[in-house]
Amino acid sequence: MSMLGERRRGLTDPEMAAVILKALPEAPLDGNNKMGYFVTPRWKRLTEYEALTVYAQPNADWIAGGLDWGDWTQKFHGGRPSWGNETTELRTVDWFKHRDPLRRWHAPYVKDKAEEWRYTDRFLQGYSADGQIRAMNPTWRDEFINRYWGAFLFNEYGLFNAHSQGAREALSDVTRVSLAFWGFDKIDIAQMIQLERGFLAKIVPGFDESTAVPKAEWTNGEVYKSARLAVEGLWQEVFDWNESAFSVHAVYDALFGQFVRREFFQRLAPRFGDNLTPFFINQAQTYFQIAKQGVQDLYYNCLGDDPEFSDYNRTVMRNWTGKWLEPTIAALRDFMGLFAKLPAGTTDKEEITASLYRVVDDWIEDYASRIDFKADRDQIVKAVLAGLK
């Protein structure tokens, strides 16, 4: 029987192993022993990020772009391999082509987080010592920041968990590292929201830092009802790890997350004397921009422009966009109900409409247009405004 007809592969088959050993040349085929010579650099020279990340994860020979050969010597019960192409609908000639534009790996990522915390600590010390909390409107502080901004941490926590499958099933190390960091940044945002609430509890007598009230709003309230359903779907109901990662960042968070963070809390906070919440939101927006660059490289530059599967991948991503756009619009429509709880005169329909157009236009330019998804900005805004009371 020919080697192609054998069911067993590589080292699991002694006969095939003997054939392989016999075919090995006596002298090395390649005498280059420079570190990482087998990695194709994205930039002018091989970066530290690439040298320590690319091809660190072993791969079977059916994972496109890898350097290994043969099958796994160990498998899950039932014969499932450690990684398999069946975990995603997207296809490519090279799963190892993606690069994080910011070249993040473990050490610089941890360093960045440490620097952010030190800066946050200094800011909070100055804020407290200066008594700036006295300028914040108590209703805004106790109702909108405590309850509704606090409830948003569960949105970010759910999106963090939506990355768990991709962090396990990703078919290459470069993809896995990016997915993991996108997820960690989401849980970091959730922690920053609770940090703000904990800080307020220290400087405002009677302010409750417990998550009981925000959790009740997230699980039982009307403002986040459709958002909760969307997050639960992205986290628990998607088999394809690329679908969940793509839909979180290229659809849901780019629309709903951006509106909540930037166009509601960050835009309105100064009107209530709140310069504390925008400090944390600016960090969250930095994470959003970092993830956007990585998402665009992975899904548009690599998979969307794949030399063999570009048309197919774009079709799949357009289908995912259409699938998750409706739940996202529903989440925004429900969130419109929060404007009715604001004091009269805080904002008006004209400003809210302009905010929606900013978010939708950014989404179309940065995401939808990159895969030729036809989106009607006016129709989206109209559908969302139907929830404005």
Curated annotation (Swiss-Prot):
One of its GO terms (biological process) is one-carbon metabolic process. GO terms for molecular function: methane monooxygenase [NAD(P)H] activity. Keywords: Monooxygenase, NADP, One-carbon metabolism, Oxidoreductase. The keyword Repeat does not apply. Signal peptide: none annotated. InterPro entries: Ferritin-like_SF, MethMoxA_beta, MP_mOase_hydro, Phenol_Hydrox, RNR-like. SUPFAM superfamilies: Ferritin-like. Its EC number is 1.14.13.25. It catalyses: methane + NADH + O2 + H(+) = methanol + NAD(+) + H2O; methane + NADPH + O2 + H(+) = methanol + NADP(+) + H2O. It comes from the Bacteria. It holds the Pfam family Phenol_Hydrox. The keyword Cytoplasm does not apply. It is an enzyme of class 1 (oxidoreductase). Responsible for the initial oxygenation of methane to methanol in methanotrophs. It also catalyzes the monohydroxylation of a variety of unactivated alkenes, alicyclic, aromatic and heterocyclic compounds. M.capsulatus has two forms of methane monooxygenase, a soluble and a membrane-bound type. The soluble type consists of four components (A to D): protein A, comprising three chains, in an alpha-2, beta-2, gamma-2 configuration, is a nonheme iron protein containing an unusual mu-hydroxo bridge structure at its active site and interacts with both oxygen and methane. NCBIfam families: MethMoxAlphaMmoY. This is Methane monooxygenase component A beta chain.
